[in-house]
Amino acid sequence: MKKFIKILKVLSMAIVLSACNINGIFASNLNTTNEPQKTTVFNKNDNTWNAQYFRIPSLQTLADGTMLAFSDIRYNGAEDHAYIDIGAAKSTDNGQTWDYKTVMENDRIDSTFSRVMDSTTVVTDTGRIILIAGSWNKNGNWASSTTSLRSDWSVQMVYSDDNGETWSDKVDLTTNKARIKNQPSNTIGWLAGVGSGIVMSDGTIVMPIQIALRENNANNYYSSVIYSKDNGETWTMGNKVPDPKTSENMVIELDGALIMSSRNDGKNYRASYISYDMGSTWEVYDPLHNKISTGNGSGCQGSFIKVTAKDGHRLGFISAPKNTKGGYVRDNITVYMIDFDDLSKGIRELCSPYPEDGNSSGGGYSCLSFNDGKLSILYEANGNIEYKDLTDYYLSIENNKKLK
């Protein structure tokens, strides 16, 4: 699909009355009669791609207000090991209408298993939009199916220099070793961390990654990062975080340090780490580590962004499912907030944009975005990808005098 297909998406008329329950001091400052409407951006019931399932949301809000949403196009169902491309949806009217485009195709080697998936995106200081994804052509789990570097695996990058109108051909980041520095010799494979990356105050691009390593005759997987100082031409890999079974993650910058919020399989809470040396070393970040429950059962991806409020307070927002029902249900995608300039307030719940149960075949993922006072979320909803504008909830914080 090389041309945009203009399709009008009608906003859902149903307002989810229980969508966002305001916690404590936010309630008095929010017009709760104006609950955010949902927009189905990627819909398994339309014929844009004739796909049976959409997963893995990534969201960017550009400087001019243009929104770019990304998703796996899972043609034959929710499965990870299947035939998958990556699609983008672009809106210039605050989500009322969307244009669609396939931005990364798989290698077309195997009609059942060729896939590119788990996109992670960033917008650089030059306005370039970079997307990184994992690529495979055979069946098997990315982290456990082999004991050495997988022969069918690569990490691919595409980019756009015109606000997502056109996209480059795929750039292989792993075949050419000059493009990736410091990749460990015991690597099984790696892929991006899912969601979005950041641009630091000095212009350095940082992308979260998850990496599988062969250690002591066993495979382990960890969270980490890669970073670029030349607008994505070459990348340097950081080291793994201290704990295995961490994987999908996102990072923010605070006073030159990197703070990570990570999936943490089997531990029932999200993990968090801080690095003062661009990922060469990591240590536990106590204000967030093991503070957000992810229920019993599987861990899950979550989003993590930093916002500077009008009063100068630096706020962190994290979205993740509570998973109160355990397993892979991943119900109640909730947005949490922490004030990095007043950690005594702890972590507070802002809202639950998706209070329903997730689809255990694949659900619970989300991606937050913030630009020019607008807070947005893209999330998985039973095989679709939905969007909500959470700006009213953000304004409830801005208007709260206790924050100042």
Curated annotation (Swiss-Prot):
Q: Which Gene3D superfamilies match?
A: 2.120.10.10
**Protein name stated in the entry:** Sialidase
For the protein in the UniProt heading, the enzyme class is hydrolase
Q: Which UniProt keywords apply?
A: Glycosidase, Hydrolase, Repeat, Secreted, Signal
The organism encoding this protein is Paraclostridium sordellii (Clostridium sordellii)
Record-stated family? Belongs to the glycosyl hydrolase 33 family.
Protein localization: Secreted
Kindly state a single biological-process term from the GO annotations of this entry: ganglioside catabolic process
- The residues that hold substrate are 55, 263
Q: Quote the PTM field.
A: It is possible that the sialidase is cleaved in front of a cysteine within the leader peptide, forming a glyceride thioether bond which links the protein to the membrane. A second proteolytic cleavage releases the mature extracellular protein.
Query: Where would I find the BNR repeats?
Result: 89-100, 158-169, 226-237, 273-284
Catalyzes what? Hydrolysis of alpha-(2->3)-, alpha-(2->6)-, alpha-(2->8)- glycosidic linkages of terminal sialic acid residues in oligosaccharides, glycoproteins, glycolipids, colominic acid and synthetic substrates
Report the Pfam families cross-referenced here: BNR_3
Q: Which PROSITE patterns match?
A: PROKAR_LIPOPROTEIN (PS51257)
The Gene Ontology terms for molecular function here are: exo-alpha-sialidase activity
Which lineage is the organism of this entry classified under, starting from the top rank?
Answer: Bacteria, Bacillati, Bacillota, Clostridia, Peptostreptococcales
Q: What does this protein do?
A: Sialidases have been suggested to be pathogenic factors in microbial infections.
Q: Which residues form a coiled coil?
A: none
Which CDD domains does the record match to this protein?
A: Sialidase_non-viral
Mind telling me which residue stretches traverse the membrane in this protein? Answer: none
Task: Tell me the first and last residues of the signal peptide.
Answer: 1-27
Q: What is its EC number?
A: 3.2.1.18
